[in-house]
Amino acid sequence: MPPKMRITKDMIINAAIEVAKQSGYEYINARTVSARLHCSTQPVMYHFSTIDAMKRAVYAQVDHLHSEYMMRISPEQDPILGIGLNYIRFAVEEPQLFRYLFQSGYAVEHSLVEMIDSEELIPVLAAM
């Protein structure tokens, strides 16, 4: 008998990102994610005590992907222009993920001061 496939937290997060890309962040739930992984809902609920906890983890990963995407600028390009164009390009190429980041209410920062102090902003500011 072959060993059971192990479903990791990262696998769940990646599957949830795919659900968000295809259908929108509103459709991230235990059933849609487990269906994407071809498993029961048990592994999803094992790794995340609530669906909200899973959505927050997915949000953090999407935010990280967005930051990496924005920083893909060539050395000869003006950093401010490059970051701005990548911001727009991300919105065009990944509209569902862009909505998740900026319209879902899952943003960690609740004030301008928290946003400025965010570690994700350090490479953006360093490029300028």
Label every PLM stretch briefly.
Residues M1-I7:
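N-terminal intrinsically disordered/low-complexity leader segments
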Residues M11, A15, V19-A53, A57:
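Helix-turn-helix
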Residues V19, Y69, F90, A127:
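Short alpha-helical functional segments enriched in proximate histidine and acidic residues
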Residues R56-G82, P123:
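Amphipathic alpha-helical linker/stalk segments
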Residues V58-V62, H66, Y87, E94, ...:
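Hydrophobic/aromatic residues within well-ordered alpha-helical segments
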Residues L81-S104, H110-L112:
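Helical hydrophobic small-molecule/effector-binding pocket
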Residues V108-M128:
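Amphipathic alpha-helical packing segments from all-alpha helical-bundle domains
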